[in-house]
Amino acid sequence: MVQTNLEVVDDTLHLPRILCLHGGGSNAAIFQAQCRRLIAQLRSEFRFVFAQAPFLSDAEPNVMSVYSQWGPFRRWLRWCPDHPEIRPEDAIRAIDDCLEDVKRQDDAKGATGAWVGLLGFSQGAKMCASLLYRQQIRQELRGRSFAGSDYRFGVLLAGRAPLVSLDPDLDLNSSLPDVSQITDAKYHGPSQDVLRIPTVHVHGMRDPHVDLHRQLFEEFCAPESRRLVEWDGDHRVPLKYNDVSLVAYQIRELATQTGAP
């Protein structure tokens, strides 16, 4: 018998990287599966890296219907009263540690591309927008070199208002809720906290909470830097080719607009 050792070569290691944050009651592996069609359309242009949230939770109902055997399930934020209370500074530290861990793990695999974007679904999209806002505030107060990140854009799939505060020491005049609070109820704006880093928002027109997604788009993101994709779907990641193509096109446009390498 002839034995051969076939080494699989990862041809995305040099590509610019997009950090991906799953929804609440899900996990990194599930979100990667949900994004498979988007990855397929962009795999020669970006490397997608999927982070795992720090806190355990029950599965979100839509997740349970398809991925019930894919646990354990995790969350970034509290959305139920029975989720254990936590100090804001401890929640922020746990979230940041998760993100830095997955970055280090990807570096260890040999990846070298710049971290150019954030992509999130549902609670993960709220987190992405909040991370971008923290970066924006830090860049304004400390300068770009001391912001801790340099993401050029965000892709927010079914992300709902409001943003949450991820650096209370800098958000002294902010009306944002802190990261330890339950923030899924309708936010009563308008908000003085406006994200100007470019974003594309993806809204399913049959999503029961699309009004909250519109609120994030309209009240928390600057008109000159936001884009919108609407598709005929509910609370999930688009999978049909034409729907995914619209999202992929806007990601390419954002990358070009922001000079992402």
Curated annotation (Swiss-Prot):
Keywords from the named record: Hydrolase
GO MF assignments: hydrolase activity
UniProt EC number: 3.1.2.-
Xref: Pfam families: FSH1 (PF03959)
Induction of synthesis: Expression is stimulated under green light conditions.
Gene Ontology terms: biological process: secondary metabolite biosynthetic process
Active site residues of this protein: S122, D207, H235
SUPFAM superfamilies found in the cross-reference section: alpha/beta-Hydrolases
Cellular-component GO terms for this entry: cytoplasm; nucleus
Superkingdom: Eukaryota
Disruption phenotype: Leads to a significant reduction (over 95%), but not abolition, of citrinin biosynthesis.
Protein role: Non-reducing polyketide synthase; part of the gene cluster that mediates the biosynthesis of the mycotoxin citrinin, a hepato-nephrotoxic compound to humans due to inhibition of respiration complex III. The pathway begins with the synthesis of a keto-aldehyde intermediate by the citrinin PKS (pksCT also named citS) from successive condensations of 4 malonyl-CoA units, presumably with a simple acetyl-CoA starter unit. Release of the keto-aldehyde intermediate is consistent with the presence of the C-terminal reductive release domain.
Family, similarity comment: Belongs to the LovG family.
Protein name: Esterase citA
